[in-house]
Regions:
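Short beta-strand "wing" residues that participate in macromolecule-binding interfaces
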Residues: 63
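N-terminal helix-turn-helix DNA-binding core of bacterial DNA-binding proteins
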Residues: 6-47, 66-77
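Glycine-centered, phosphate/nucleic-acid-interacting loop/turn motifs that mediate DNA/RNA or nucleotide
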Residues: 59
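Residues within the DNA-recognition helix of helix-turn-helix
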Residues: 51
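Amphipathic alpha-helical dimerization/coiled-coil segments
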Residues: 2-7, 24-25, 83-100
Length: 100
């Protein structure tokens, strides 16, 4: 390893622990509503919303808002870019762990 080089260059959007948890859930579940993510992550509504917004801005998450009767529903899923980014992240982490 050269001086001044980071040990591991990974996608910082995904690497943040709360977003990593969200992306992992969406990768395995394909789609999840906001309340499911809220319960599974243990985040507050505001934190979950903020992290989903960052993932959406990066093009990793698709957020669909609709109504079921009069009840609002927010459905989240990974985009193909999000799936690819998560798979790349996993590969990088696995390769790094094999080196240590």
């Amino acid at each position: 390893m050269k001086d001044n080089q980071p040990i591991l260059e990974v996608d910082r959007i995904i690497h943040e622990p709360a977003r990593l948890l969200i992306v992992t859930i969406l990768y395995t579940a394909e789609k999840a509503d906001f309340l499911f993510l809220l319960n599974e992550t243990g985040l507050t509504r505001g934190n979950l919303s903020t992290h989903l917004t960052k993932l959406e801005a990066a093009g990793y998450v698709n957020i669909e808002k609709s109504f079921r009767g009069k009840i609002p529903q927010t459905l989240c899923s990974l985009t193909s870019s999000g799936q690819e980014a998560f798979e790349k992240y996993r590969k990088q982490i696995n390769q790094f762990l094999k080196r240590t």
